[in-house]
Amino acid sequence: AYTKQEGITNVSGYERFTGRANVTHQTDKVLLEANAMYTNSTQNVNNEGTSFASPIMCYAMTASPSTYPYNEDGSFSSNFPALNGANPIQTETYNYNRATINRFLGSMAATWTIWDNLKLKEAISYDFNQNNERIWWDPRSNDGRSSNGVYQRVMGNRGQLNTQTQLSYNKSFGLHNLDALVGFETEDYKYDYLYANGNQYPSYLP
């Protein structure tokens, strides 16, 4: 499946690819099941809050009908006195905030009918989520001017492994029903996070 959405601001948007597969196999006494899903998402956003790259903040709080983003020669205007000359269109042209997210969710299960309605089920599942974010504040923008450019990287990996063991039995005796279930479950969760930034760049980054 494919999804693409355009944001309400010039450089914002969302794109996603999703794939899914399911397999089931049944024999006389054994049921095998396997499921897998993979998603790749790319998201472009404007910085929010009170940053100079926040167009919503600028337009709603500081811009007026006399404000113009471009000069007559096509260059960016600095006629934004309330923002100390910061032009939000110039800022969003040079700055970026991009995130790529990969997620995998897979599971396998085997159910064995031992005798009559006595069943043993073993299941294992793994959920992995990876986030990779890149943020650039250009020296030509007010966000990065004082530091001569700021580049930030945020990386996070989340992994969760689950296993389940279930022994179940059900039986009907006339008007009576008997159900019994014994189970055991384990969970292993890991999270890795890395943040890094740098400034004082000798040139502009693309």
Where is each model-derived feature located?
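Residue-level recognition of beta-strand termini and adjacent short loop/turns
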Residues: 28, 113-115
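Surface-exposed loop/interface segments of Gram-negative outer-membrane beta-barrel transport/assembly proteins
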Residues: 7-12, 18, 22-103, 123-206
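Transmembrane beta-strand segments that form the barrel wall of outer-membrane beta-barrel proteins
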Residues: 1-4
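An active-site-proximal structural segment forming one wall of the substrate-binding cleft
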Residues: 118
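A cytosolic small-molecule/anion-sensing beta-strand core signal
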Residues: 106
